[in-house]
Amino acid sequence: MFRWGIIFLVIALIAAALGFGGLAGTAAGAAKIVFVVGIVLFLVSLFMGRKRP
């Protein structure tokens, strides 16, 4: 998940440097969503792993 977030961030930065506002905004939005989903999944796996049988 974090890999995809970093990829979208790099795409957004390159697009912003080249002046493509729409593409940069879309890639940045996708990067934010992927990052948040990754954080949520990490926290869920962290707490689910602490339970003892």
Swiss-Prot record:
Annotated membrane topology: Multi-pass membrane protein
Cleaved signal peptide residues: none
TM ranges: 4-24, 30-48
Intracellular or extracellular location(s): Cell membrane
Record key words, sorted: Cell membrane, Membrane, Transmembrane, Transmembrane helix
Main location: membrane
GO CC, one annotated term: plasma membrane
Pfam family name, one: DUF1328
Record family assignment: Belongs to the UPF0391 family.
Name by which UniProt lists this protein: UPF0391 membrane protein YtjA
Organism of origin: Salmonella typhimurium (strain LT2 / SGSC1412 / ATCC 700720)
Phylogenetic classification of the source organism: Bacteria, Pseudomonadati, Pseudomonadota, Gammaproteobacteria, Enterobacterales
Gene that this polypeptide is encoded by: ytjA
